[in-house]
Amino acid sequence: MSDTPKRCGFAAVIGSPNAGKSTLVNALVGEKVTIVTHKVQTTRFAVRGVALAGETQIVLVDTPGVFAPKTRLDKSMVAAAWSGAGEADTIMHVVDAGARARMEHGGAKSGDSRMVEDDDRVTEGLKKTEQKAILVLNKVDLMPRDQLLAMSQELYETGVYSEVFMISAKTGSGVPQLREFIAGLMPEGVWHYPADQVADLPARILAAEITREKVYLRLHEELPYASMVETEVWKKLRDGSLRIEQSIIVERETQKPIVLGKGGSAVKSIGEASRKELEEVLGCKVHLFLNVKVDAKWMARRSHYKDVGLDFDV
């Protein structure tokens, strides 16, 4: 039996939408626990992933991106991000180093300017709360070292960061070192989850998130951000398999044919991809049935917020 005391704590991951927060959480855990797509603001609520480092359990809170909110859903998501940060033992601010470098040295892509503005918004938010964070420069694998050093120095001098790590969440470069460092910051205490549990997310919500990811991956250039997936039926069958019925909800009638596709081809492809991953995650055969609904006011319905732990009244 090890003489090393057990440790357990919470580490929040904050940053601009699409900075690579979800990819980093998955890399730290070693398994997929949160969805990753081309779309910004994919993570809508705080998802907890559970990473292990020796005798230490790190509960990673993958928060929604911090950005300038416009809708009720936006405001709820940003509030959830700061709530997750405020309750954590340590905070990681993930910055897309490539986007920041392109803004400074030329070759900027669409969305880079907004991402840098959102990063600065996080930095200012940390200043106001007087919380120290770990600066995680992500997507550094294709950047010149001199640019990285200058960038890290500039951000470190804001006074809100205790450490700087340079990583590539996608390739895994620098991730083990970051995991070990975070583990050293966790307080002594009993583990909150069994050793083999990698996520704290109800199965019904996890299933909806998996299908939502497939919707975005299949239709990311055609379907607006304003869509959601709801798990309506979850039935265990006699043979041990699962019957899952879900609705893909969009805001307008004109969006419904996009999700369905010609002859139902798009929704069929989404269903096949989702069913395959659900079977891997749940460890049983899954019978998945998808329906497409139009609900112009889904973002204004309190029940949708409550289901995923967002504050409707923020």
Curated annotation (Swiss-Prot):
It is a peripheral membrane protein. Keywords: Cell inner membrane, Cell membrane, Cytoplasm, GTP-binding, Membrane, Nucleotide-binding, Ribosome biogenesis, RNA-binding, rRNA-binding. Residues 62-65 are annotated as: G3. GO terms for biological process: ribosomal small subunit assembly. PROSITE patterns: G_ERA, KH_TYPE_2. Residues 167-169 are annotated as: G5. SUPFAM superfamilies: P-loop containing nucleoside triphosphate hydrolases (SSF52540), Prokaryotic type KH domain (KH-domain type II) (SSF54814). An essential GTPase that binds both GDP and GTP, with rapid nucleotide exchange. Plays a role in 16S rRNA processing and 30S ribosomal subunit biogenesis and possibly also in cell cycle regulation and energy metabolism. This is GTPase Era. The gene is era.
